[in-house]
Amino acid sequence: MKVHVYTGGKRIVERSGVGRAIEHQKDILRAEGVTVDGVRFKDADIVHINTVLPDSALAAMRARIMGKKVVYYGHSTMQDFRNSFKGSNVLAPLFWRWITFCYNLGDVVITPSEYSKFLIESYGVKVPVYAVSNGIDLGFWKADKEGRRAFREKYKLTDEEKVVISVG
C-alpha cells in the first residue's frame, strides 16, 4: 500500500501541533510497513490530508476524482477557531461551513479526541469520524537517569522531593 501524506501549506503549520502530527503519522505508517517516503500523489492508493487550507480541499477533490481514498484529519473545530483572533467570532459561521465541506471530502475523518469527534459529527459531517489520540513519541519521553540528575541539580531539588511535571 502506498500513502501520500499531502503537505501543501506545510510551512504554515510545520511548527504547530498539526506539523508534529504529520511527522507522527509518517513515522507510524513507516513502522507498519506502509510506503510513505517519496510516494507521488498520482501513485498513491490513499491520500492523507491534515489541514483545511484551500489547497488541501483541492487536493482532496483531485484525489477523489482519481479514485483514491482520502483520510482527512480533523484538527480544526469551530469552537477552537472562535476567540482565536480579533474578528474570529464574526468569521466562525463561515469557518464552520468550510470545515464541514472539507471534512466531507474525506472517506473518513480522524480526530484526536471524543470531544472533537462529537463536535465534527454535530456539524453534519456525513462520513465516518473516528477519535484516535495523536499519541506521543515514547522514544523521546523515556526514563533518563542522567537527565533526571541534571534536572534536580539545576533546580536544586533533593532525591526525596516530589516533582510534578505537566506536558500538553
Label the predicted regions:
Residues 142-157:
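A short helix/loop element that forms part of the nucleotide-sugar donor recognition site in Leloir-type
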Residues 8, 68, 72-97, 139:
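Acceptor-binding helix/loop patch of EC 2.4 sugar-transfer enzymes
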Residues 115, 135:
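Carbohydrate-associated surface elements
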Residues 1-41:
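N-terminal subdomain of nucleotide-sugar transferases
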Residues 36-55, 69-73:
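Short N-terminal targeting/anchoring amphipathic segment
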Residues 46-48, 62-81, 108-110, 130-131:
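Active-site proximal beta-strand in glycosyltransferases
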Residues 158-168:
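Conserved donor-binding/catalytic core segment of Leloir-type glycosyltransferases
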Residues 65, 90-109:
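Membrane-proximal helix-turn-helix segments that form the acceptor-binding/catalytic region
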